[in-house]
């Protein structure tokens, strides 16, 4: 029986943080090690350039950081194909063909794109490359004939747009060439881990993220300065657990649920200080992140080897994408010279 094919990845705009780790990276490693899937993991540098075109150095520098984070958490290049988007030129031609099947109004209606346009203050001047990136994403997915795409809920509209493109292509040309992917929200993952300041999203620019590469003292400093319940002023005050960032992290990382529930009850009725709770969280995070940090340092000793992994993975992925593009070109009827020379 053929394995399911997975495509997933990240934009290289900085080092990866623990939000990425619990939101997707741990799940990727589990899927990889299950042996049930063929995994393609993309570093989407071209997509990152759609809103960083004037700062390409940021993307170049982040590429190797993301690769190191992948290897550190356990993504194995012998089991998963790690690729760099810009090294697969076939993706660009597929994007061009798919653009002919999508209207401008449909792109503008995509809820994910609309939200990101507002977030990035692009309302008055939307880069064309940014607006069409859902089509580029459809090219990424279909190039490798991915059957499964693990995503968060906010990315579901992107997968639906890819499915529409697949259906349009197959219907117009009367041939089932492209595979319609299904979106899967990984079980056991949290939605989005808030920043250490309690804001909805971790962000490098805000400085509210704990990175996989952070040293132990940096992690401790970030944990001890985390946002808690502003009304929990004295130890004896009853504290609010719900919406308390420290407890949100504990819900995510603490495996001792009995101890955690006792701690929540104690905090809620009063008598348990924030410092003690934060120290408990720090111990848990240190135990989780120390092995990852140590593996990262080992890979960092041989950066040329990391680039070799990326190059070999990209070459392997390109062979697959080239096969899909050939099918697409033949189906459209633009392989003009095949039967002549």
Curated annotation (Swiss-Prot):
Transmembrane spans: none
Catalytic activity: tRNA(Trp) + L-tryptophan + ATP = L-tryptophyl-tRNA(Trp) + AMP + diphosphate + H(+)
InterPro entries recorded: aa-tRNA-synth_I_CS (IPR001412), aa-tRNA-synth_Ic (IPR002305), Rossmann-like_a/b/a_fold (IPR014729), Trp-tRNA-ligase (IPR002306), Trp-tRNA-ligase_bac-type (IPR024109), Trp-tRNA_synthetase (IPR050203)
GO molecular function: ATP binding; tryptophan-tRNA ligase activity
Pfam families: tRNA-synt_1b
EC number: 6.1.1.2
Subcellular location: Cytoplasm
Protein residues bound to L-tryptophan: 140
Binding residues annotated for ATP, in chain numbering: 11-13, 19-20, 152-154, 193, 201-205
Gene Ontology CC annotation, any one: cytosol
Keywords of the record: Aminoacyl-tRNA synthetase, ATP-binding, Cytoplasm, Ligase, Nucleotide-binding, Protein biosynthesis
Motif, 'KMSKS' region: chain positions: 201-205
CDD domains attached to this UniProt entry: TrpRS_core
Database matches in SUPFAM superfamilies: Nucleotidylyl transferase
Chief localisation class: cytoplasm
The family this protein is said to belong to: Belongs to the class-I aminoacyl-tRNA synthetase family.
Alphabetical list of PANTHER family matching this protein: TRYPTOPHAN--TRNA LIGASE, MITOCHONDRIAL
Protein name: Tryptophan--tRNA ligase
Taxonomic classification: Bacteria, Bacillati, Bacillota, Clostridia, Eubacteriales
